[in-house]
Amino acid sequence: QSQLEAVFAAVNNLSAQTDPNFKAPVATDADKIVTSIPEQLAREIAATQMATPEGFNVHPKLSPQLAKRVESLNDASIDWSTGEMLAFGSLLKEGRPIRLAGQDARRGTFSNRHAVIVDKENGNEWTPLRALISDENQFFVVDSLLSEYAAMGFEYGYSVEREEALVLWEGQFGDF
């Protein structure tokens, strides 16, 4: 009990140790950071969207959206979901594990992501970007329950334990 009280007193009596006038340093080499990917890699990533497994039944309204991702590379009309797909795919190709969680993360809040596609006939699932990696455990997109603190707490803990991974939690639109 005395140790607990001593720790409480030490934490409770902390003095301010940061300068309220602190200014973050300005990055001077920002223009030297290369964030682009080669066109061939972009095309390889986009091609996963049309590599439907044999016997898999993609919903007829979804097929054109997936095809548009591939076509958008030809006319430079890349939308948000295609850009996200290219970013995730390029990170996977570099060997970086990715975990994305949120109440509607697999489909995307506005029906835009489609990271996991469900067969309309039998409910089987297909995760197109997993075609880029040999270990499917390197890419997880999961729908979590609508419990922000619990979901964020788990994802935070996951990110601490797996520092090399890109761990994201996506809040559901309108829930805040």
Regions from the PLM with identified roles:
Residues 1-176:
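Flexible, glycine-rich loop/tail regions that form catalytic "lids" or insertion modules at the edges
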